[in-house]
Amino acid sequence: YKSLEDLIKLGFDRVLTSGQEATVPEGADLLEELVQIAGDRIIVMPGCGITERNFPKLRDKIKAKEYHIYLPYETMSKMKFHPGHIYMGGLLRQSEFTITHTSSSRVSDVMGTL
């Protein structure tokens, strides 16, 4: 817990973390401990892999004050030319022809569970 204490001593007011795991569901045990240890000295903000489905369970276990949740939807871009063999976004070959937005209705649904 030294890193958490170091952040507090340095004056940080918030830390975004998945609990030293790839996602919050995997790091939930450590996140629960960090939130308890931090108390009101720093906000531990769990983030990565939180969905509408797992949020209630994670919220009840971790008991953080804030959460970072990605709730997207996509729309088609207005691009006319779609060369399917050229990828500008790197090796993962993500769509070049969509725009990702935050879904306000999904956010409202999650907020309604608080």
Range-by-range predicted roles:
Residues D13, I43-M45, D109:
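A general secondary-structure boundary signal
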Residues F12-G27, I50, I62-G84, L91:
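Glycine-rich phosphate-binding active-site loops on the catalytic face of alpha/beta enzymes
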Residues Y1-L10, L31-Q36, V44-P46, I50-I69:
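Catalytic cores of alpha/beta
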Residues G27-I37, K57-I62, M76-L114:
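C-terminal helical cap(s) of enzyme catalytic domains, especially alpha/beta-barrels
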Residues A22, P46-G49, T98-H101:
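Short N-terminal micro-motifs specific to bacterial/archaeal maturation
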